């Protein structure tokens, strides 16, 4: 007869009517019993012949997560003009005095961040935007291009102009300006001015003056630079070696490399094409010629280039006869002025050699499960985390549940701050640009690659045999709808583009590490600046705690102003005030301890509701289930040990079958959650020790001993001794000399014993006692006569590696008398 749930509970000693612990508990360590129970609950039977189940509720295998849904009305989020101040260390020092070594080191790591992988694989531009939504190809293409354009405008991306130069928007950092141009370094004379050396044409300098308000010194600079070494270099290295499908960047930046013999008449239309702010009457009158001007490479490049230069694909439709009712020329003729073929940033810098390729693909998804109106860009740089050349990312400490509870479980009022676009605060060195490239090959190649009726001839370097091969009803309808959204930007977005990251991207394993270092350093500074405040962060989640609500509000204002002065952007709409129970990292933390948040409890209920019994479940789905159950395991009676059968099946990559008893056992475990309480410091007065044959306890002046029926492995014996000490004395601080018991990981013990011990020792704190000093050592060896003196061993709760204690300075004595006695200013308060 299979083991019933009631019997199983009694076996695990979870019921009160169990016999004496000293007899019952050692039985659970018996290998035979564990094997029989495993067979009864069908836990050991890993080889099954029935087909596996691949979906349980919302859980599918790890590698086939739910299919994202495309939303044609996604809004591209706006990005504030994020510019983290370069002298952030000085600013903090002005605010709080000298920084500690740790804070300084962490802030130096991100000013600027560096990324140098050993090996980078370059992919063709066609792979730039992933065809993630086959039904909505064109729509997804333009939405993604618009998102990338928004990031570039916000100063988060560089735009590759030529192999060695890039342009960007926003405020430059010093490491972006001091880059070497040719043989000499070119320092910008006045900030905010285009660092592109003007070519000697009066017309051009006029344009630049009017657009950028150049100071007089810049004119002198222009004359000085005409015979620069790098305009000579440009003539030596042809800029013409371009991969197919990428148009020459001749329209703007490359003009500077043109040899001085290039006539003014050649340069002015190019300038006009590049900057629509200049009057465009001439361009409108002869739209056909504008195209030709537009793509003329500099004369130097043209002389050495054998390849034909292709005119702008989009504008070519203007002069061609419509091929049908759905010809793209109808759309192109909607507007006279489609604007420039390319845009250029406010600043140009020199970069290491960057090929016209991408290193990762991008696509859009919902911003988060609760916000499907806005999109989020997913960047896939997974090439750096796999294969032979994978980068092993730095590890960093994340506080475990007990440390977090020790730290944050208190009677404080809490609020959490939301850092907007946290990753995009941290600047990357331009030298990382060649490794982090995204982009697209332009609409023509994107559509051609994916549509069936058009053919690409590679020997023609990506030209189409016939311009109208593209025209199709689907494309026409999509573009017409998109025209209502994007207007003349359709032209700009249909061109190829290559962008590199200027701030750290989310798809690289280095980014979470850098973000964690950055926010923890900032919180450390805040804690020292405001001694009565507890500031803590995990990634971009920053929480502030204070003794009273009034104090918290004034702190909030002061801390917000401090963060804004460093250039950190907060999202005021998302500031949450939690009262006395803080919601953080998926937990609710209050003075009583911590519990999982409601949405996780809801997920647990759903999971058990849909969990099939007696059906083999694919081990990948088990991974998902264990992920959820593992998060809440510390709040259950038996903890992680209860999940060991599941872990075992995942490790052996076998299907797992839930028996009704095991499911009922887990269900009861997870429907009654117990808070994890804060550990309190105290003195240890109860000690336990064991040998393979016997155990001994020392409680105050009392000594006890006992023997096991059969010799046991030493770790098992030590665990049993600790359980006896806890049940006999009721003390929640125990001394032991066994490191495994000390670690409170009971997953390596016999399964039943691990489950029972977890419940008996729940909420117990352990102190390490060296064997030589352990008062329970003698009784465990059967010697009761000798009494070693009891040690005075203090227990201090740990906050893990989250070093926090900035000791509060004493409060000045001349405070006015009417300060309320509960005011945090009156008592120098230290974190719990």
Swiss-Prot record:
Query: Which keywords describe this protein according to UniProt?
Result: DNA replication, DNA-binding, DNA-directed DNA polymerase, Endonuclease, Host-virus interaction, Hydrolase, Inhibition of host innate immune response by virus, Inhibition of host RLR pathway by virus, Magnesium, Metal-binding, Multifunctional enzyme, Nuclease, Nucleotidyltransferase, RNA-directed DNA polymerase, Transferase, Viral immunoevasion
Which residues does the annotated region (Disordered) include? 186-229, 275-305
Give the InterPro entries listed for this entry.
DNA/RNA_pol_sf, DNApol_viral_C, DNApol_viral_N, HBV_DPOL, Rev_trsase/Diguanyl_cyclase, RT_dom, Viral_Replic_Matur_Polypro
Tell whether Ribosomal protein is among the UniProt keywords: no
**Signal peptide (residue range):** none
Q: Where does Mg(2+) bind?
A: 418, 540-541
What sequence ranges are listed for the domain Reverse transcriptase?
346-589
The record's annotation in Pfam families points to: DNA_pol_viral_C, DNA_pol_viral_N, RVT_1
Q: What does the record give as EC number?
A: 2.7.7.7, 2.7.7.49, 3.1.26.4
> What are the BP-aspect GO terms?
DNA replication; symbiont-mediated suppression of host innate immune response
Question: What are the residue positions of the site described as Priming of reverse-transcription by covalently linking the first nucleotide of the (-)DNA?
Answer: 63
> Does this entry carry the keyword Transferase?
yes
Question: What is stated about domains?
Answer: Terminal protein domain (TP) is hepadnavirus-specific. Spacer domain is highly variable and separates the TP and RT domains. Polymerase/reverse-transcriptase domain (RT) and ribonuclease H domain (RH) are similar to retrovirus reverse transcriptase/RNase H. The polymerase/reverse transcriptase (RT) and ribonuclease H (RH) domains are structured in five subdomains: finger, palm, thumb, connection and RNase H. Within the palm subdomain, the 'primer grip' region is thought to be involved in the positioning of the primer terminus for accommodating the incoming nucleotide. The RH domain stabilizes the association of RT with primer-template.
Specify the protein name.
Answer: Protein P
In its UniProt entry, the species of origin is given as Hepatitis B virus genotype D subtype ayw (isolate Japan/JYW796/1988) (HBV-D)
Q: What is the lineage of its organism?
A: Viruses, Riboviria, Pararnavirae, Artverviricota, Revtraviricetes
Q: Which gene encodes it?
A: P
């Amino acid at each position: 007869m299979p083991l019933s749930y009631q019997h199983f509970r009694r076996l695990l000693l979870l019921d009160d009517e169990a016999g004496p612990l000293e007899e019952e508990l050692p039985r659970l360590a018996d290998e035979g019993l564990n094997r029989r129970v495993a067979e009864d609950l069908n836990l050991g039977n890993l080889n099954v012949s029935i087909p596996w189940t691949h979906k349980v509720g919302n859980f599918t295998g790890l590698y086939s997560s739910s299919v994202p849904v495309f939303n044609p009305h996604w809004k591209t989020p706006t990005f504030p003009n994020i510019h983290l101040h370069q002298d952030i260390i000085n600013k903090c020092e002005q605010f709080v005095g000298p920084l500690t070594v740790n804070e300084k080191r962490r802030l130096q790591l991100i000013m600027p961040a560096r990324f140098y992988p050993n090996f980078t694989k370059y992919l063709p531009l066609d792979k730039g935007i992933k065809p993630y939504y086959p039904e909505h190809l064109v729509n997804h293409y333009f939405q993604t291009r618009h998102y990338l354009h928004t990031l570039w405008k916000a100063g988060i991306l560089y735009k590759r102009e030529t192999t060695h130069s890039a342009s960007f928007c926003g405020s430059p950092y010093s490491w972006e300006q001091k880059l070497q141009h040719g043989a000499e370094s070119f320092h910008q004379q006045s900030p905010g001015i285009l660092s592109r050396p003007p070519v000697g044409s009066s017309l051009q300098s006029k344009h630049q003056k009017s657009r950028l308000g150049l100071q007089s010194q810049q004119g002198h600079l222009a004359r000085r630079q005409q015979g620069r070494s790098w305009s000579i270099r440009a003539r030596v290295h042809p800029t013409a070696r371009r991969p197919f499908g990428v148009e020459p960047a001749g329209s703007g930046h490359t003009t500077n490399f043109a040899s001085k013999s290039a006539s003014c008449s050649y340069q002015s239309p190019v300038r006009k094409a590049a900057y629509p702010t200049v009057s465009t009457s001439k361009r409108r009158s002869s739209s056909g010629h504008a195209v030709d001007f537009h793509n003329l490479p500099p004369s130097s490049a043209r002389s050495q280039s054998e390849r034909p230069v292709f005119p702008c694909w989009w504008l070519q439709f203007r002069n061609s006869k419509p091929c049908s009712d759905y010809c793209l020329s109808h759309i192109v003729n909607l507007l006279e002025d489609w604007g420039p073929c390319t845009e250029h940033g406010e600043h140009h810098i020199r970069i290491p050699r960057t090929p016209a390729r991408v290193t990762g693909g991008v696509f859009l998804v919902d911003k988060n499960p609760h916000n499907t109106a806005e999109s989020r860009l997913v960047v896939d740089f997974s090439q750096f985390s796999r294969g032979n050349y994978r980068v092993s990312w730095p590890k960093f400490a994340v506080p475990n549940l007990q440390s977090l509870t020790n730290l944050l479980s208190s009677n404080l009022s809490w609020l959490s701050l939301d850092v907007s676009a946290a990753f995009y605060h941290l600047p990357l060195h331009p030298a990382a640009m060649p490794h982090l490239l995204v982009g697209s090959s332009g609409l023509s190649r994107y559509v051609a690659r994916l549509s069936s009726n058009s053919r690409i001839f590679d020997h023609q370097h990506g030209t189409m045999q016939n311009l109208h091969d593209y025209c199709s009803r689907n494309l026409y309808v999509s573009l017409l709808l998109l025209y209502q959204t994007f207007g003349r930007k359709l032209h700009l977005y249909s061109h190829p583009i290559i962008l590199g990251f200027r701030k750290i991207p989310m798809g690289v394993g280095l980014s979470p590490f850098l973000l964690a270092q950055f926010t923890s350093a900032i919180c450390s500074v805040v804690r020292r600046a405001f001694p009565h405040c507890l500031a803590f962060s995990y990634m971009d989640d920053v929480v502030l705690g204070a003794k009273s609500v009034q104090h918290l509000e004034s702190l909030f204002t002061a801390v917000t102003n401090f963060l804004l002065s460093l250039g950190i952007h907060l999202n005021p709409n998302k500031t949450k005030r939690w009262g006395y129970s803080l919601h953080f990292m998926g937990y609710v933390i209050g003075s009583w301890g911590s519990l999982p948040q409601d949405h996780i409890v809801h997920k647990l209920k759903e999971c058990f509701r849909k969990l099939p019994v007696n059906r083999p479940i694919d081990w990948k789905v088990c991974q998902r289930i264990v992920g959820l159950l593992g998060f809440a395991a510390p709040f259950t009676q038996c903890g992680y040990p209860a999940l060991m059968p599941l872990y075992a099946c995942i490790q052996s990559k076998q299907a797992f079958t839930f028996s009704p008893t095991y499911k009922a056992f887990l269900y009861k475990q997870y429907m009654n959650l117990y808070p994890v309480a804060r550990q309190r410091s105290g003195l240890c007065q109860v000690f336990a020790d064991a040998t393979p044959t016997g155990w001994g306890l020392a409680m105050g002046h009392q000594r006890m001993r006992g023997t096991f029926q059969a010799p046991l492995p030493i770790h098992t014996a030590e665990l049993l001794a600790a359980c006896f000490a806890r049940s006999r004395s009721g003390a929640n601080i125990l001394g032991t000399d066994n490191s495994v018991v000390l670690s409170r990981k009971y997953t390596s013990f016999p399964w039943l014993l691990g489950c029972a011990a977890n419940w008996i020792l729940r909420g117990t704190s352990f102190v390490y006692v060296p064997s030589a000093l352990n008062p329970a050592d003698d009784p465990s060896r059967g010697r009761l006569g000798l009494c070693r003196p009891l040690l005075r061993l203090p227990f201090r709760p740990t906050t893990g590696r989250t070093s926090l204690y900035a000791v509060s300075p004493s409060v000045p004595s001349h405070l006015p008398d009417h300060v309320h006695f509960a005011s945090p200013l009156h008592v120098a308060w230290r974190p719990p």
